[in-house]
Each structure stands twice: as C-alpha cells, then as structure tokens.
Amino acid sequence: MQCALYDAGRCRSCQWITQPIPEQLSAKTADLKNLLADFPVEEWCAPVSGPEQGFRNKAKMVVSGSVEKPLLGMLHRDGTPEDLCDCPLYPASFAPVFAALKPFIARAGLTPYNVARKRGELKYILLTESQSDGGMMLRFVLRSDTKLAQLRKALPWLQEQLPQLKVITVNIQPVHMAIMEGETEIYLTEQQALAERFNDVPLWIRPQSFFQTNPAVASQLYATARDWVRQLPVKHMWDLFCGVGGFGLHCATPDMQLTGIEIAPEAIACAKQSAAELGLTRLQFQALDSTQFATAQGEVPELVLVNPPRRGIGKPLCDYLSTMAPRFIIYSSCNAQTMAKDIRELPGYRIERVQLFDMFPHTAHYEVLTLLVQQ
C-alpha cells in the first residue's frame, strides 16, 4: 500500500506497510505458531485476509489546530498535531465528511481542545460507516456541554451537506486524560443506532458499543464461527463478552438455546434488537460481567464461545470453565499472547482447529479463532 503520510515520515501507525501482504501474513502465522508451539494443533486453517486499503469503517480523530483551521488526526508524542484525513486505510466516502466537518467546526464555534493549555472544547471526532447502506454515525467528544446549544443551532447545515449522517451525538469527556469517551452521551438525532448487516444477519451499532473496524474480515470471522458451530452437536451455548451479538447471532439456530453476556448495556440493546428482527426467541442477552455470570450458573452448555478484550479471559474464568467442563470452547482473540496463556490454564482441552484473520493489515496485530475440544 502506498501512503504519502508514511513516506513523508508524518505517521508510523502502520509499521509493516513496506512489506507485501503475503509476507505480513507469513510473519503473523509464524508468530501464532510460535505462541502455540507447546500445544498439539489438529488442523491449521489457511489465514483469511481482506482489502489492504480503504477497509476501515471507523475513524477516531483527535481535533487540534484552531477553530478556524482545525486539524483532524493525531498528536505526536511531543504534542505536534498531524492531519490524517488522507489516510489510505479510510474508504473514499470519509473524505467529503472530513471536508464538511472542518468549516462546520468553525460555524459551531467548537474550539479544539489544547492539551498543553487544558483549554478548548472539542477533543475528538468519531465517525463510523455502515457497509450495508452507507449510513454514518458521527460523535463529537466535548470537554463539557458549554457549546452544546451552539452545536445544535449549527447542525441543520451539516445535515444538509451530509444526509448520510443517520446518528449524531455529543459525548462529554471532562477529564484531562487521553480517554476517548466519557459516560454521558447526548443524542442529536431521533435515530440512535446505525444499521449494519453481515452475512444476512442484522447488526446494530450504538455510540458506546464495540464493533470490529474491518467489516470485510469481521464478516468472514463470524461466518467461520457459524460454520464451526454447525458442525458440532450443540443445542445450548453461551456467548461471553458478546458485544453487539455478532458471534451469537450468526451461530444461533431457531431450536438452539443461547445466552449472550456483555458488560456494556449499549451493546446488549443492539444484540436484543437483532435477535428480535431474526425472530430468535430462545436467545437471551444480558448486560453482566462475563466471569461473574459464568461462575454463578449451575447449568452447563455444550459450547462456550469467548471473545474477550486484549487482556484475555483470565485465570478465574479459565478455572471455572475447567470445572464446568463444556464439551467445546471457541476462543476468538485479538491478542494471541493472552489466548495462549489462557489455553495453558485449560489443561482438559486440546486444540482441534486454529485460523488466523488479518483484521489489522500493516501492523503486527491479528485476530485468531480457536476450537478447543474436551480431552
């Protein structure tokens, strides 16, 4: 992939950009095999990759510069701002949005937050696009609600310029720390969730719910999990750390009992909406801590699917899964190091199948799906 920002030394986020994709995949596969070297693996499936540019459905832009000339991008470690509107990871559809946002910031008087001076209001612009209909969700992350009335007043102009903006919100993040969002979300549109669709499964994205940033590869990840589950004798499963329900909604069948657990209420609201649309009455989604839920249950499902954050599922949940002993565990991980550590804590299981998904091209990161079977 050619990137003018990288060539000019202005951005180094894509550390592997100079390597061809096949070389990147080989290096990632070697890393994964090294991490799982102590475990016999029955089947290594071929790695899955997607487009090498224009694949991201989300932009997280630090706002800097002045209210008249805002910059959207990032801050270097020394505080120097960098405009990343031309980043080739973004689809072409993002360019007109960034172009309209810059004059809008001036119109609404949204002074960019100055980290050094601890002054200003607009900290971040967060943009998400649906692959199914091109609709977009735009979030303004502000230090306070001081400029909220001005923003509301100026908003009709922006909506006229960009009718694709279906969901618009203000998030209040008052603390002087590099935290992307605060707890308070104020909706400026009637619509509160963005409609998405992977493999004919309706999914919903709300402002504070996690959603994969590479739809082309994520849809293949969910479809693969569905195929693996369909090959197993499973009538009852848990989907832990389920997010908006991507895995569970793909894997569920009308006669399957499925419980999805996620700590974020926003994500659970999305999952419930999708389940209702699909008419899947035996699906339950609850906003709880996954470990606390699992350890409080008396019943044992045949399959537990886990999709934890980078820290992994941790020893308490590993210990409980070992005791509870479901016949199958499917582990989806964005950090193979913590996954390998967790598998070490599950000695009663063997690795049946592993597949790497290149969710993050041009970086060392990847997603991996692993099927564990009780020994």
UniProtKB/Swiss-Prot annotation:
Keywords recorded for this protein, A-Z: 4Fe-4S, Iron, Iron-sulfur, Metal-binding, Methyltransferase, rRNA processing, S-adenosyl-L-methionine, Transferase
Catalysed conversion reaction: uridine(747) in 23S rRNA + S-adenosyl-L-methionine = 5-methyluridine(747) in 23S rRNA + S-adenosyl-L-homocysteine + H(+)
An annotated Gene Ontology molecular function: iron ion binding
Top-tier EC class: transferase
InterPro entries registered for this protein in UniProt: 23SrRNA_MeTrfase_RlmC (IPR011825), MeTrfase_TrmA_AS (IPR030390), MeTrfase_TrmA_CS (IPR030391), SAM-dependent_MTases_sf (IPR029063), U5_MeTrfase_fam (IPR010280)
Gene3D superfamilies, A to Z: 2.40.50.1070, Vaccinia Virus protein VP39
Disulfide-bonded cysteines: none
The organism's place on the tree of life at top rank: Bacteria
EC number: 2.1.1.189
Binding site for S-adenosyl-L-methionine: 212, 241, 262, 307
Residue sites binding [4Fe-4S] cluster per the record: 3, 11, 14, 87
Function: Catalyzes the formation of 5-methyl-uridine at position 747 (m5U747) in 23S rRNA.
HAMAP family in the record: 23SrRNA_methyltr_RlmC (MF_01012)
Family listed: Belongs to the class I-like SAM-binding methyltransferase superfamily. RNA M5U methyltransferase family. RlmC subfamily.
Name of the protein described by the UniProt record: 23S rRNA (uracil(747)-C(5))-methyltransferase RlmC
Name of encoding gene: rlmC
